[in-house]
Regions:
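Sec-dependent signal peptide recognition
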Residues: 1-6
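C-terminal motif of bacterial Sec signal peptides marking the signal peptidase cleavage site
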Residues: 12-15
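Short, low-complexity, disordered segments immediately C-terminal to signal peptides
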Residues: 17-28
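Active-site-adjacent betaalpha module
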Residues: 28-101, 118-119, 129-133, 137-138, ...
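Acidic/histidine-rich, surface-exposed loop or edge segments in extracytoplasmic proteins
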Residues: 103-117
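Short beta-strand segments at enzyme active-site cores
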Residues: 105, 141-147
Length: 272
């Protein structure tokens, strides 16, 4: 799955206007997370319960230095040595609208830099927004996190398409300052949410470092997942087109923090 943004520059945008249509070109980075997937096809069937709950299975992946056996555990060579097997390992996971929520981290359109409005906004229009629309229509909880505009003059407004979901009651907009981690976890427990699928910006900053971000949510009783095509990093000066920082961040997330989900896999399932 190629990342869908790299070096795609739009015309200058006023903060929070709708980004123009994006056309892919030869400068776009090719980063196929799933090229090494030689596993069998999984059943993409979506089932609907009597209560309207949708359930479906997705193939996810994570990287491990240690060999992972068929039971999902380690093979011990001795009391002090574990068999190694540097590789991606695949996990077929059951998701449902009852136990899975989507998180969109800081999808701002009022960054203090127009370039970031264009760069991250292009990703949102191409992948993040369509996925959230599909998730909401399927009955999934969609949670959008941002700063409280009462406390900040910028980095608060979310992109227009996501704001429309909030206005229509199809997504929740939560302010970071209102939701310390313990309160957020209690909310998830009350709503029966055990799985969190993360998207948003930036992958190497807020997505992992916020109190409700991936790194801080490890070990809190929730299964964590990340859709890298619905995110992008704060790159170095010379890597905006190649997305090298996002690639490295995705690897780190997939290695020790969350299982990765392919955008096309989950989008196609939810659109059924």
């Amino acid at each position: 799955m190629a990342f869908l943004l790299a070096g795609v520059m739009l015309l200058a945008l006023a903060a929070c206007t709708q980004p123009a249509e994006i056309e892919e070109d030869e400068t776009m980075a090719s980063f196929d997370l799933w090229a090494d997937d030689d596993g069998a096809e999984i059943d993409p069937e979506v089932t609907k319960g009597e209560d309207g709950t949708l359930t479906y299975k997705l193939r996810t992946k994570s990287y491990s230095h240690w060999y992972i056996n068929d039971e999902g555990g380690y093979d011990y060579l001795s009391e002090t040595k574990i068999k190694t097997g540097d590789d991606w390992y695949y996990y077929d996971i059951d998701f449902s609208t009852a136990d899975t929520a989507f998180i969109v981290m800081d999808p701002w359109c009022d960054w203090a830099d127009d370039y970031l409005n264009e760069y991250f906004g292009a990703v949102t229009e191409k992948t993040t927004l369509p996925l959230m629309q599909a998730a909401a229509e399927s009955g999934h909880k969609v949670i959008i996190l941002t700063n409280d505009p009462a406390n900040f003059k910028y980095n608060t407004k979310i992109t227009p398409g996501l704001q429309e979901l909030v206005d229509a009651g199809k997504a929740e907009l939560l302010y970071h300052s209102d939701w310390p981690q313990d309160k957020f976890l209690a909310k998830l427990d009350e709503e029966g949410i055990t799985k969190l699928i993360y998207t948003g910006y930036a992958s190497n900053m807020c997505v992992i470092t916020r109190d409700l971000g991936i790194s801080k949510m490890i070990g809190k009783g929730k299964q964590l997942f990340f859709v890298p095509e619905c995110s992008a990093a704060m790159e170095h000066a010379d890597t905006w087109e190649t997305q090298e920082v996002h690639k490295a961040t995705t690897f780190i997330i997939g290695q020790v923090q969350a299982k990765l989900i392919d955008f096309e896999d989950i989008y196609n399932v939810l659109k059924k």
